Amino acid sequence: MLISADSHVVEPHDLWVEALPASLTDQAPRAVQDPSNHHWYFEMPGHARGVDLTLSRTAGISNADVGARLAADPSAWIGARGGHDPHERLRDLWADGVHADVLYPTAGLSLLQLDDASFQAACLRVYNDWLAEFCKTDPDRLLGIALLPLWDIDEGVRELERAKALGLRGGLFWTSPPADRGHSFFTAHYEKLWAAAAALEMPLSIHILAGHRTKNSVAKFGKSIEDTFYFGFESRDEVQRSIVELIAAGVFQRHPKLNIVAAEAGIDYAARLERRIDSTFGRFLSLMETPLTEKPSHYFRNNVWCTYIADPVGLNNLRFTGADHIMWSNDYPHGSATWPRSNESVSQECEEFGIDADTRDKLTWKNVARLYDIDLDVVRDPSPHL
């Protein structure tokens, strides 16, 4: 059995144009087709171009094939429809041996980088309402993660509570805060959110490309070799830095039942991060005030859950990190997805690195089921909506 801890919906092109109040229509995020390559891109008036929505649904299809098919027919639909159609998704997942998946946004990631608090909150409510309807098709197998507005922390807490009532299973907040607005993770700004998430038993997440440090990364991607390579490092470094900040700030010391998922940043950094934060703690932090009563790696292993897609370096280092807080994901329907050969991909990696059956089960379904309280007796069988 496989359960993906990080997959994606691909929002309808006109979701926000149709659902936001008429007074916000001109500002509404939308999909726009580029006449030069016929790809659809997520755009917001007055902002840099966002994610390539065409390539966000092309699991199992090469970029070259996408280009050739669009050149022949610019209006062609290419790729999976499960990003916006829950019934198609359930069929695609079952065919791939995936019994359930945790759903993150595609276009919606960049909404967490908006500076206009009221406009952002309106956009996030639209997304969360749509996602809740999507997941209602099969709530045991489609586990939606809500987007949370954090400029006003009370608004963020209310939205997390609303998400819980809607049947969503967690909340996603900005991966890194704006550097110049007094919202560092070391401040008390977030305390109500940490407490609410722990009390509600709602895991929180940070995801690559959803923070203020990487605000323009997507727009720059592909423009130059420098920006393209930097994109690959910057998006994951942002997640790692925020993990360290949350640990050092004593967030998990104060809220031991809080769970935070580091999504799509991989696990190749995990052993190095553990060693470095413990070394720093042992050598330097004893010379100053610290809220921590345990080694930093204790909080990393007990409160931070890391997802990976295909990560040979990270899997080779499981002997250092353990496997109890690491979760496999297939990234469907994005171009980097293991779909439609997820079982083959997992089996190859496990064989190559000598991963035993119990560890494989932890990585591919036990850990995620434990974190999100997935009913395994239900999801073992095919969805009634197939």
Q: Where is each model-derived feature located?
A:
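Mid-to-C-terminal alpha-helical segments outside catalytic/metal-binding sites
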Residues: 1-3, 12-100, 129-137, 158-162, ...
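Hydrophobic faces of well-ordered beta-strands that scaffold small-molecule active sites
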Residues: 3-5, 101-103, 143-146, 171-173, ...
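Di-metal (Zn2+ and/or Mg2+/Mn2+) metal-binding site signature of metallo-dependent hydrolases
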Residues: 8-9
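Active-site gating/metal-coordination segments in enzymes
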Residues: 65-242, 246-249
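Short, electropositive alpha-helical surface patch
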Residues: 156-167, 262, 274-275, 282, ...
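Glycine-enriched alpha-helix->loop->beta-strand junction motifs that scaffold or abut catalytic
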Residues: 165-170, 198-203, 223-225, 255-258, ...
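Aromatic-lined glycan-binding groove of carbohydrate-active enzymes
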Residues: 204, 208-212, 247-297
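Aromatic-anchored helix/helix-loop segment that forms the rim or "lid"
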Residues: 233-242, 247, 284-315
